[in-house]
């Protein structure tokens, strides 16, 4: 079993854990409808970058 040779300082411990925390997903607002959606994804209304790309049930 591996055993460390020297104690890891609090600074180095923090640097090691720096990428462990979750980040929020990038959110975009559709210019046409004002709908909130994930970036590079179609909005719930079927719009992508100001154009209607998917037919929805309401159409």
From Swiss-Prot:
One of its GO terms (biological process) is translation. InterPro entries: Ribosomal_bL32 (IPR002677), Ribosomal_bL32_bact (IPR044957), Ribosomal_zn-bd (IPR011332). Residues 1-24 are annotated as: Disordered. Keywords: Ribonucleoprotein, Ribosomal protein. Belongs to the bacterial ribosomal protein bL32 family. PANTHER family: 50S RIBOSOMAL PROTEIN L32, LARGE RIBOSOMAL SUBUNIT PROTEIN BL32. This is Large ribosomal subunit protein bL32.
């Amino acid at each position: 079993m591996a055993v460390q040779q020297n104690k890891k300082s609090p600074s180095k411990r923090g640097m090691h854990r720096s990428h462990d925390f979750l980040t929020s997903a990038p959110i975009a607002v559709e210019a046409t409808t004002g709908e909130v959606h994930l970036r590079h994804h179609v909005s719930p209304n079927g719009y992508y970058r100001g154009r209607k790309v998917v037919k929805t049930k309401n159409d």
